[in-house]
Amino acid sequence: NIFKGWNRSESRTVVTLKQVPVFKDFSQKEFSELEKLIHHRNYSSGDYIFKNRAPGEGMYIIMHGSVKITIGTRENNENVLAELGEGDFFGELALFDDEPRSANAIATSDSDLLGFFTQDLMALQERNPVLGQKILFNLGGVLGERLRGTNNLLIQTQSNNIE
């Protein structure tokens, strides 16, 4: 094929996915397969993407915009856990268990998100087990990094309280 290796312009979806550590070592073919499973969602500033204790359906990747992750039920009792921007992802624990959400996710600007949901991961596991395992393995690595960061923060906080 004379077009083999020809560099077509990538979709915005693939450009965004390439920024996400979970998909860091994917081939173009794997990105094409993954792109078929992605759901596009749009939120206005102030919209809840999900609420604490709601059923978890999957993870979201920020293509454009910003999102804050909070705990607490009222505006004046809200603790911001994270402020996220383009290329960041959240809600990934829903891909591993059936537990309800442990926080709120709220758009802080008009936002375009990519959704990757549990049912799509399950279907991918059946159709292409190698790619499904690659996603889960990479997600596990990211979760491990986040847990280490949380542990270090906890140790630092405890050290500051002792002093």
Question: What function would you assign to each model-found segment?
Answer:
Residues 1-163:
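Cytosolic regulatory regions built on CNB/CRP/Popeye-like sensor folds
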